[in-house]
Amino acid sequence: MYPLARRILFALDAEKAHHFTLDALNTVYKLGLIPVTDNRTKPIKLMGMDLPNPVGLAAGLDKNGEYIDALGALGFGFLEIGTVTRNPQPGNPQPRLFRVPEHQGIINRMGFNNHGIDAMIRNIEKSKYQGVLGINIGKNAVTPIQNAADDYLICLEKAYAHASYITVNISSPNTKNLRALQGGGELGALLEALKNKQAQLAAAHGKYIPLAVKIAPDLDEAQIEDIARVVKSVEMDGIIATNTTIDKSSLGSHPLAGEQGGLSGFPVREKSNRVLKKLAEHIDGALPIIGVGGIMEGGDAAEKIRLGTTAVQVYSGLIYKGPALVKECLKALAR
């Protein structure tokens, strides 16, 4: 069924197809046509939370939390929505999303287009989803990098009562200078400020919401070691590895190889796994790792678990394989 739908969708502009697919999924869900599936196939603990299974949806698919219920019916163990920012912003000019089917890849330079944290919270409040929900937060493009912490702190405060966990996105290549926050000094200062705010919010709300950070695949070993040292030092609850890559050498002479933006899907798999392996060595079990990047089939999910992750997330693989990828990953992890 999905291969036929994909042929039609791939004939459309990538961003239009994205919205059309999600709207169609929402309609099918509201009509009660998505079969109810038992997603408690491999229960795990992650950052103190009970998950029915370790296969999650990565941030980026549902930026505003408009499709939570429909996505929650696809068998995921957890969902992550966003990236959301303090204020609404349009993102980068279109076209900004490109498929590279010859390489099973996607290039995006979306630029955190979203309706803002307040709109997202309204959508969450309307949702009936009872599962684990992560909120991925970023900074507005107009916010100077030296004031980035202000944006993250406001998003953290607003999201806190509505999230199962919160992810700090400092690794998108599509917001100017954002990746500079991955540097040791900058990273330590930002995460320490967020951990202090987390402690205040936990006391005020009477519940502890875990805090994770999402890193890039374009890191050398010294940078990976530095990040591992910082996240252990400030006692982050989790780390997500990895975001998209700016390295498009794997695309060779493909016409889209010169497009600006982050590359995801199959081409990022090996780079992501290299970072993941080194990160796991340096983290040494101090906090859980969520693996994302290049999961196109069940074996890719199993490989990330073998490299040291507690859970995995998918996104680009869904575009190429459809919802069947979730079951395929769960089957591979059950072996």
UniProtKB/Swiss-Prot annotation:
It is a peripheral membrane protein. GO terms for cellular component: cytoplasm; plasma membrane. It holds the Pfam family DHO_dh. FMN binds at A59, G60, L61, D62, K63, T83, N136, N169, K214, T242, G265, G294, Y315, S316. It catalyses: (S)-dihydroorotate + a quinone = orotate + a quinol. It comes from the Bacteria. Binds 1 FMN per subunit. Its main location: membrane. The active site is at S172 (nucleophile). Its EC number is 1.3.5.2. GO terms for molecular function: dihydroorotate dehydrogenase (quinone) activity. It is found in: Cell membrane. Pathway: Pyrimidine metabolism; UMP biosynthesis via de novo pathway; orotate from (S)-dihydroorotate (quinone route): step 1/1. Substrate binds at K63, N108, R109, M110, G111, F112, N169, N174, N243, T244. Its cofactor is FMN. SUPFAM superfamilies: FMN-linked oxidoreductases (SSF51395). InterPro entries: Aldolase_TIM, DHO_dehydrogenase, Dihydroorotate_DH_1_2, Dihydroorotate_DH_2, Dihydroorotate_DH_cat, Dihydroorotate_DH_CS. Monomer. Catalyzes the conversion of dihydroorotate to orotate with quinone as electron acceptor. Belongs to the dihydroorotate dehydrogenase family. Type 2 subfamily. This is Dihydroorotate dehydrogenase (quinone). It comes from Neisseria gonorrhoeae (strain ATCC 700825 / FA 1090).
